[in-house]
């Protein structure tokens, strides 16, 4: 069976990354494409399901996983830990399913070091003006908060060249098509096609 591909997807806040991934998943069968499920020590929110939204663990369990290098990446956010389990990712990839991981540039660097065969995609907004509009459209944040978000977005965007693919999300449908095209091209790589069609190739080359 052909091994699935791990896709690392990063973008500044407001670039439409989460919306693109969710739209992609709706067009792909579950046996082809899934989104990574992280471990976290925070408490479940109403409606969240263990194993579907997150793997909920306590602090001792999380630290034990850190001690045995069980995470591809992990970080602490507002007193809670979040991490991507190597075992959970590898189990899904072994079934031939592609996995999408929504993560920032720092986490992406950690993962590329441990899984160099992962493919990475960076999503940019079409302009700073449009990014500012999207950030303001989310809620009634103060100018100070918006300025901070914009500064964080610029810092995130400065790492775009570390990625394999670049998508500019100007028109959503076009950006979604670009994302699908990347997946299609990766699935046609020789290494995956050779595994997928091994029996056929053997028959074609037989005397």
Swiss-Prot record:
Keywords in alphabetical order: ATP-binding, Cytoplasm, Kinase, Nucleotide-binding, Transferase
Segments forming domain Guanylate kinase-like: 4-184
GO cellular component, one term: cytosol
Alphabetical list of Pfam families matching this protein: Guanylate_kin
Places the protein is found: Cytoplasm
GO molecular function: ATP binding; guanylate kinase activity
Catalytic activity: GMP + ATP = GDP + ADP
E.C. number: 2.7.4.8
Annotated binding of ATP, by residue: 11-18
PROSITE patterns reported in the protein's UniProt record: GUANYLATE_KINASE_1, GUANYLATE_KINASE_2
InterPro entries: GK/Ca_channel_bsu, Guanylate_kin-like_dom, Guanylate_kinase, Guanylate_kinase_CS, P-loop_NTPase
Top EC category: transferase
Gene3D superfamilies: Guanylate Kinase phosphate binding domain, P-loop containing nucleotide triphosphate hydrolases
Domain of life: Bacteria
Function: Essential for recycling GMP and indirectly, cGMP.
HAMAP family: Guanylate_kinase
Family per record: Belongs to the guanylate kinase family.
The protein's name in its UniProt record: Guanylate kinase
The gene coding this protein: gmk
């Amino acid at each position: 069976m052909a091994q699935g591909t791990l896709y690392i997807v990063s973008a500044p806040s407001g670039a439409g990354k989460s919306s693109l991934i969710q739209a992609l998943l709706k067009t792909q069968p579950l046996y082809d494409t899934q989104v990574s499920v992280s471990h976290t020590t925070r408490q479940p929110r109403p409606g969240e399901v263990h194993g579907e939204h997150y793997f909920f663990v306590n602090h001792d369990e999380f630290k034990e996983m850190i001690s045995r290098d069980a995470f591809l990446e992990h970080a602490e956010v507002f007193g809670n830990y979040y991490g991507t389990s190597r075992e959970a990712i590898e189990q899904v990839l072994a079934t031939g399913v592609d996995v999408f991981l929504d993560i920032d540039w720092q986490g992406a660097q950690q993962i590329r070091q441990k899984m160099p065969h992962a493919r990475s995609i960076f999503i940019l907004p079409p302009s700073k003006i449009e990014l500012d509009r999207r950030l303001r459209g989310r809620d009634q944040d103060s100018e100070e908060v918006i300025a901070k978000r914009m500064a964080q977005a610029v810092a995130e965007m400065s790492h775009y060249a570390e990625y394999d693919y670049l998508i500019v999300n100007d028109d959503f449908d076009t950006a979604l098509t670009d994302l699908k095209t990347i997946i299609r091209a990766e699935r046609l790589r020789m290494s995956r096609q050779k595994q997928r069609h091994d029996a056929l190739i053997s028959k074609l080359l037989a005397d």
